[in-house]
């Protein structure tokens, strides 16, 4: 017998954010760390290219704002999904409260990154 009214899951939404965050973290975060954490301090990229006005101009553009928001929020969604499923794997069955705590943390980081970008 086929169930005509199956229970719908919200898991595809979380898996989508998990996958997008993992992709962002694997592909864009290392380049960002290389440029901002290694090349600029070593002087390979001149300090005049990273002055306040240029960086503020980039961050306040739509592409720059989306990049900064994505760099903060996407890895956070990935990490919180891992924490949620990691707790389950370690037999910490927190149920809905753990799920809400993990995903609310990621949502809070996303909202704060958006708010702080608009404060610049």
UniProtKB/Swiss-Prot annotation:
Keywords: Cell inner membrane, Cell membrane, Membrane, Transmembrane, Transmembrane helix. One of its GO terms (molecular function) is succinate dehydrogenase activity. SUPFAM superfamilies: Fumarate reductase respiratory complex transmembrane subunits. InterPro entries: Fumarate_red_D, SQR/QFR_C/D. Its main location: membrane. It is found in: Cell inner membrane. GO terms for biological process: fumarate metabolic process. GO terms for cellular component: fumarate reductase complex; plasma membrane. It is a multi-pass membrane protein. Disulfide bonds: none annotated. HAMAP family: Fumarate_red_D (MF_00709). Belongs to the FrdD family. This is Fumarate reductase subunit D. It comes from Aliivibrio salmonicida (strain LFI1238) (Vibrio salmonicida (strain LFI1238)). The lineage of its organism: Bacteria, Pseudomonadati, Pseudomonadota, Gammaproteobacteria, Vibrionales.
């Amino acid at each position: 017998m086929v169930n005509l009214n199956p229970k719908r899951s919200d898991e595809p939404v979380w898996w989508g954010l998990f996958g997008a965050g993992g992709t962002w973290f694997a592909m864009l975060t290392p380049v960002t760390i290389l440029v901002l954490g290694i090349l600029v301090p070593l002087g390979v990229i001149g300090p005049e290219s990273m002055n306040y006005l240029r960086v503020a101009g980039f961050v306040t553009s739509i592409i720059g704002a989306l990049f900064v928001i994505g760099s903060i929020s996407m890895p956070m969604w990935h990490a919180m999904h891992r924490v949620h499923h990691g707790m389950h794997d370690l037999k910490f069955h927190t149920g809905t409260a753990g799920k809400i705590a993990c995903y609310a943390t990621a949502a809070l980081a996303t909202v704060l990154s958006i708010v702080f970008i608009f404060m610049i």
